[in-house]
Amino acid sequence: MSVKSILTEPNKLLRQISKPVENVGDEERRLMDDMLDTMYAAPGIGLAAIQIGVPKRIIVMDISRDEDKKEPRYFVNPVIKNKNDITSKYEEGCLSVPDQFAEIERPNECEVEYLDYNGKKQLLKADGLLATCIQHEMDHLEGVLFIDYLSKLKKSMIIKKLSKIKSNRIIV
């Protein structure tokens, strides 16, 4: 298991649509382990495979917020089967959009079908932060970032700021 580099906006790979996983095998489990290590090291509560440059429909998350009681979740080929009409707002951030946060409104409940770490089909009814995190990470699988829900002006300002930060980096 190893910590990988996280891609940051602007990066064309982040706008790519991820491809379904044919089979959950050792390679996919190693990827999920690396994703989880990367997410914890960042630190964050969710990560999509595309954020480390792998265009597969895989997301990992852990919303437990307790260092001693980690509760990792693995979603392969997740599909939202149902969403609630009632929405809630959470201030979202993203490891691929560093140090930027915005209040985003999403359905406060969703039902998601997916394959787990071992390739077994699962159905989960999620609400609150878990539902928000699932929807946020699943957006990555479609090439969508949380900043895409903002006004054009706000989004443009964030991208300019991130581009400037990237161009000022010195790699030694």
Swiss-Prot record:
Active-site residues, as the UniProt record annotates them: E137
Cofactor note: Binds 1 Fe(2+) ion.
InterPro entries, sorted: Peptide_deformylase, Peptide_deformylase_sf
Root EC class: hydrolase
Entry keywords, A to Z: Hydrolase, Iron, Metal-binding, Protein biosynthesis
Known catalytic reactions: N-terminal N-formyl-L-methionyl-[peptide] + H2O = N-terminal L-methionyl-[peptide] + formate
Superkingdom assignment: Bacteria
GO molecular function: metal ion binding; peptide deformylase activity
Enzyme Commission (EC) number: 3.5.1.88
Binding residues annotated for Fe cation, in chain numbering: C94, H136, H140
Cofactor requirements of the protein: Fe(2+)
GO biological process: co-translational protein modification; translation
Classification via HAMAP family: Pep_deformylase (MF_00163)
Protein's job: Removes the formyl group from the N-terminal Met of newly synthesized proteins. Requires at least a dipeptide for an efficient rate of reaction. N-terminal L-methionine is a prerequisite for activity but the enzyme has broad specificity at other positions.
Similarity field: Belongs to the polypeptide deformylase family.
Protein name as annotated: Peptide deformylase
Phylogenetic lineage: Bacteria, Pseudomonadati, Pseudomonadota, Alphaproteobacteria, Candidatus Pelagibacterales
Gene of this entry: def
